[in-house]
Structures are given as C-alpha cells and as structure tokens.
C-alpha cells in the first residue's frame, strides 16, 4: 500500500465556546504552526468581541490567516473560503510550518476537506434582484419558488435561511440547472495535506451551556453592545434595506443584539435569546461533527493528556518540528 506523503495539518473542531482558540494557539506555539481560521464570522471586519476574534497579542504570537477579509455588508462564500484556505495552507507548508485549521463552521470545513462542485460564480445583479423579491414576498415565498424548481435543495434548506435560498435561486437563474444537480457532480481535487481532526467538546451538555453563558457575559462586560452600535452606524449598513439578512449581521449574538437595539425586548431578554441561539448553534455543530467519522473527540478539561498524545503520534513522522512547552 502506498504511503501518504502529503504534508500534515491539524483541524481543531468543536462547538462554540469549547476552547478551540486556546488549543490552536497552544498547538501553534509548540509545533511551529500557523492558524487558518475556519469561522464564518471572523472573515468580517468589525466583528470582534461578539465573534471572539483573536486579539492583537494572539496574532503577534502566532500568524493567523483568513481574518478580516470582507466588510460586514459583503458576502463571502464557502467556495471563496476553500480557495483562500488552500492558498494559505500551501504558503504555510512552503515555510516549513504546520497548518492548524481552527473553527466551527461546518460548511467551510466540508468545502475545504471534501471539496465543492464547480458552481457558477456569483452574479451581483441576480442577487440584487432576488433580494428585491424578498422584500416583496418574503424569504418564505422565495423558498416556495425554490421548492418548485429544485425540491431536493428546498428540502435541505430551511425557509428562514436567506443566504442559502438566495444562492440556490441564483444558481438556477444563472444556469438553468438546479443547485442540487451541480452539487451532485464530483468535487474538486482533494486537499494536498493529511489532516488530523480533533473535536473539543465537553461530555456534559450542562458544562457547554455554562461555558456559553459565561462567554456571553464576558462579551457584554467587554462592551459588545457598543460594538454592535458602531456597526449599525456604518453608512453602508444603514443603506441596506434588510440588514438582518446579511451573513455578518446574522452571526449568532449579533442578530439578537441588533434586534435588541431596534427595541425588541429588555436587556435580560436579549441575553436569554442570545444564549438560546448560541446553544442552538452548538447543537447544530455537534450534529455535524458526529458525522465526521474519522475525527477524534476530547473533553477540553478531562482529556488533555490523551489529546496531546494523539497530536504527538500524528506528527511523529514530521521532520524538523520545533517544540516548546506542553499543550
């Protein structure tokens, strides 16, 4: 059997608030790595506190990639992410360093690790037309349109997911072919690195829920709401007819804060809604991660030694690895 000679990389996966950022930083410092963000909120400029974006000290200690790529009124697709991530990984490998893929956006991980079919490129005029229709008939009405032309995609896409509804209709209107047919085509070439997938997830749901609540309270203490007020004051966002349909504003926490600042409920109600939305996100992430059959799961508090052993074993054949203190 042929030996897989591809360079190595580590994917640090897990639900929100599970400790992925801390592990990625520790691993990068120990094994001469650079971090590639796999997070759909971190690509947006201005999303800092609510997205738990690595701060200046973290970025000074370890190189980070795929942060602050778009303004919050723009869109960034999974295909764009996969292309940018491949380029970043190739550059990291060329420098003789270890790529560490860290984040919790399942669509981005799938696009990168499994590949995507070659969908038609985005057409801003078509997107604008669909957005205008949404203002008239709502996203539920557009979802019904999608169900008529692509029932397979409509069954997979929730009626409250405007970004995916818009993309599916855009592809159909550009090409005349349902997006589900495009997605059934063979994916692109495999990733030119061999990846160890590690999942950080507390064994008890109550522990994860407590971490989620603690992180939200820490965000509020750091003046998260002022950050959202600054976003709301941007002229480009004020010019958007439906800002809550933008991917950046729909990011968990930001959407609930935006609605609160619109006058929807009390501060306590905002906190409860944000915590509940984050729990729901974590639940979806865990559902996706259970389908990653080749991933290895670790409790972030209990399994530190087992996690270290798994990484050390994976990297055993990697030459010239510089190490510092333990994970």
Curated annotation (Swiss-Prot):
InterPro entries: Dimethylallyltransferase, IPT, P-loop_NTPase
Binding-site residues for ATP, renumbered to this chain: 14-21
Keyword Magnesium attached: yes
Cofactor(s) needed for function: Mg(2+)
Catalytic reaction equation(s): adenosine(37) in tRNA + dimethylallyl diphosphate = N(6)-dimethylallyladenosine(37) in tRNA + diphosphate
EC number(s) on file: 2.5.1.75
Name used for this protein in its record: tRNA dimethylallyltransferase
Provenance organism: Xanthomonas axonopodis pv. citri (strain 306)
Gene name for this UniProt entry: miaA
């Amino acid at each position: 059997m042929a030996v897989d000679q591809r360079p190595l990389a580590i994917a640090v996966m897990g639900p929100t608030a599970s400790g992925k950022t801390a592990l990625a930083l520790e691993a990068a410092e120990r094994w001469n790595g650079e971090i590639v963000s796999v997070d759909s909120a971190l690509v947006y400029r201005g999303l800092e506190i609510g997205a738990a974006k690595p701060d200046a000290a973290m970025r000074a200690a370890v190189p980070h990639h795929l942060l602050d790529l778009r303004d919050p009124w723009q869109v960034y697709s999974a295909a764009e992410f996969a292309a940018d991530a491949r380029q970043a990984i190739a550059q990291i490998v060329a420098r003789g360093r270890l790529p560490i893929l860290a984040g919790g956006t399942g669509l981005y991980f799938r696009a990168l690790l499994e590949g995507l079919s070659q969908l038609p490129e985005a057409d801003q005029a078509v997107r604008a037309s669909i957005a205008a229709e949404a203002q008239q008939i709502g996203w539920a009405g557009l979802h019904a349109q999608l169900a008529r032309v692509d029932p397979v995609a409509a069954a997979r896409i929730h009626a409250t997911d405007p970004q995916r509804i818009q993309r599916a209709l855009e592809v159909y209107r550009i090409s005349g072919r349902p997006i589900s047919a495009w997605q059934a085509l063979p994916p692109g070439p495999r990733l030119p690195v061999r990846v160890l997938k590690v999942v950080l997830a507390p064994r008890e749901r109550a522990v994860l829920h407590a971490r989620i609540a603690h992180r939200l309270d820490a965000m509020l203490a750091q003046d998260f709401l002022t950050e959202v007020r600054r976003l709301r004051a941007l002229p480009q966002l004020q010019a958007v007819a439906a800002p809550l349909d933008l991917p950046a504003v729909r990011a968990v926490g930001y959407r609930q804060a935006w609605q609160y600042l619109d006058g929807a409920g009390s501060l306590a109600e905002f906190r409860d809604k944000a915590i509940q939305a984050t729990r729901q996100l974590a639940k979806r992430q865990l559902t996706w991660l259970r389908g990653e059959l080749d991933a290895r799961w670790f409790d972030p508090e209990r399994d530190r030694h087992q996690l270290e052993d798994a990484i050390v074993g994976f990297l055993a054949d990697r030459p010239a690895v510089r190490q510092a203190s333990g994970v």
